[in-house]
Amino acid sequence: AVGYILCAADYRGFVHCYRTTYLRRVLRTAPDQAAGLLGYLWCLGKIKNRPVHFHLDILPPYQRQGWGTRLMDTLCRHLRELGVDYLSCCGVSRDSAGYKMYRKYGFTESYDYGHNTVSLSLRL
């Protein structure tokens, strides 16, 4: 494996599961991690108008070799087939390699959280 891409095409279902299952489990088992997870939930609320959310991670030895673009191409093609109009990711640092890759791919900033962190969206 070179990395992965995860996508929640059902925003409401994802947020519901995040709140009722994942967040509750983490609060019981690792309460010190709750602040970051609650912050993430707040970030998700800022992209409700562009609700298809994803996460991409490429292992360091495979970065800058086109794998991220290939995974994005596959995901975008699949989402278009489902009739999805927008794809979003939240909590991206403007200083990150991911930010540069997403911008090159065509993503635009859709929300500024401050502290050099934004949500990015792509019209499919």
Language model segments and positions:
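Short acidic/polar capping segments at secondary-structure boundaries
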Residues: 60-62, 111
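Residue-level recognition of the GNAT/N-acetyltransferase active site
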Residues: 55, 59, 92
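Feature marks short, surface-exposed loop/turn motifs that line or immediately flank catalytic pockets
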Residues: 9-13, 62, 95
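Glycine-rich phosphate/pyrophosphate-binding loop shared by adenosine-nucleotide-utilizing enzymes
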Residues: 1-4
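Conserved acyl-donor/pantetheine-binding loop and adjacent beta-alpha core of acyl/acetyltransferases
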Residues: 6-56
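Conserved acetyl-CoA-binding loop-helix of GNAT-fold acetyltransferases
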Residues: 55, 64-78, 104
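C-terminal "cap" of GNAT-fold acetyltransferases
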Residues: 86, 90-99, 103-124
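Conserved GNAT acetyl-CoA-binding A-motif
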Residues: 49-52, 79-91
